[in-house]
Amino acid sequence: MVHQPPAGTRDLLPQDVTQKRWIESRLQQVFQQWGYQRIITPTLERLDTLVAGGAVQRSAVIQVQSDEESGLGLRPELTASIARAAVTRLAGSSLPLRLYYLANVFRPAFQGDRLQQRELFQAGVELLGVGGTLADAEVLHVLADALAELGFGQPPLGSWHLVVGEASLTRSLLQPFPKDLREKVRQAIAQLDRVTLESLPLESQLRDRALLLHDLRGQPDQVFAKLQQLTLTPLEQTLRDRLAQLVELYNASAGPQDSPLLLDLSLLRSFDYYTGIVFEVVYETPTGPWVLAQGGRYDRLLDVYDPQAAGQPGIGFSCNIENLQQVLLAANRLPHRPPAIDQLVIPVDSEAYGAALAEAQRLQRQDQLRVELYLDSDRRPEVVQAFAQRRRIGRIVWVSSGSAPQSEAVAVAERATTTC
């Protein structure tokens, strides 16, 4: 229908925008406290940038008609664009780079036969140019602090789960499976589909391995104990030890409102550029689990845009603003209305128009008030009072051209803009 937004998109009305800005401002405050600086990249990018050397499928990009030889598309995520900007526009900058973003991303409207939201809003950080366990722990703590700033970890929201995997370790553990079955095994493990694992045409030893990999999720000590039942290669042992160091470092430095770290070695991201830890924040609701944020380490992505980057590492995460908004709204943590207007300025007649405009500007600039100018021709006091009550305006200011403004209070039932 011509008067409706496209499938998978929606209008954000003033109340929606107020709630979205409430979330974004708190996330931004935490990002800045950790030393991250905002970056804004183009909504429209070259397709070669967006597919990240093949790590992002072209089918995941909404492509647009263009005279560009490589084609153009709408970004399905921010990491590739920021990596491209880092190795071109920020080349030579002092490392590490700490960047954050507040932006929209775009996905195809249909995933298989299922309609999904086409335009999404995200907030996130990227830490570029440094690897290691300490950098991983920093990013996890930035995420934990951001959630705490929104009220997670305290009533009425309660706890959340930080689930961490290791992409390189998981890929390596899947290598013994036949190539034609490896992806099926991976998908079954990721979807907790034990029945499929038991039905795949695998030798008994490989079936036992698949079932063990299926169970590599939960408390870290339990996962590490199960992992030791496998004969690990030197690389796998190194990755296992590095993951154990991260768990110890994160838990030792976690605050009282932070969620204990859980492990899930079946956790893989839909974008295939991750090379180290991958993680997501899961929050349980009466309707099921919601993923509020996700991210991971990508130590070869920057090489795609500059071969001279020589393995420059990176790690980051993105928060799903829509999911956060739904969870916070259900917990009564968000503003229910846009901010109320403080004063309504009414010219008593046409000769007072100039004086009314001047008074409105004085209140805005000098007193830092939210001011609305009354534009209706019906200026009867009872009509103006009713108008102010409907719009939750606290005071009325009558302005005439030859005398001082006269102010009176309005009986407004509720002017609170948030329950927080």
Curated annotation (Swiss-Prot):
Q: In which pathway does it act?
A: Amino-acid biosynthesis; L-histidine biosynthesis; L-histidine from 5-phospho-alpha-D-ribose 1-diphosphate: step 1/9
Question: What keywords appear on the UniProt entry?
Answer: Amino-acid biosynthesis, Cytoplasm, Histidine biosynthesis
Gene Ontology MF term list: histidine-tRNA ligase activity
Main localization is cytoplasm
InterPro entries, alphabetized? aa-tRNA-synth_II, aa-tRNA-synth_II/BPL/LPL, HisRS-like_core, HisRS/HisZ, HisZ
Q: Which Pfam families does this entry report, sorted A to Z?
A: tRNA-synt_His
The record's GO CC annotations read:
cytoplasm
- Subcellular localization(s) per the UniProt record: Cytoplasm
Any one Gene Ontology BP term: histidyl-tRNA aminoacylation
Q: Which NCBIfam families does this UniProt record tie to the protein?
A: hisZ_biosyn_reg, PRK12292.2-3
Query: Could you describe the subunit structure of this protein?
Result: Heteromultimer composed of HisG and HisZ subunits.
**Family that this chain belongs to:** Belongs to the class-II aminoacyl-tRNA synthetase family. HisZ subfamily.
General remark: This function is generally fulfilled by the C-terminal part of HisG, which is missing in some bacteria such as this one.
Per the entry, what this protein does is: Required for the first step of histidine biosynthesis. May allow the feedback regulation of ATP phosphoribosyltransferase activity by histidine.
**Which HAMAP family does this chain map to?**
HisZ (MF_00125)
- PANTHER family from the UniProt entry: HISTIDINE--TRNA LIGASE, MITOCHONDRIAL-RELATED, HISTIDYL-TRNA SYNTHETASE
Q: What is this protein called?
A: ATP phosphoribosyltransferase regulatory subunit
Naturally occurring in which organism (per UniProt)? Synechococcus elongatus (strain ATCC 33912 / PCC 7942 / FACHB-805) (Anacystis nidulans R2)
Lineage per the UniProt record = Bacteria, Bacillati, Cyanobacteriota, Cyanophyceae, Synechococcales
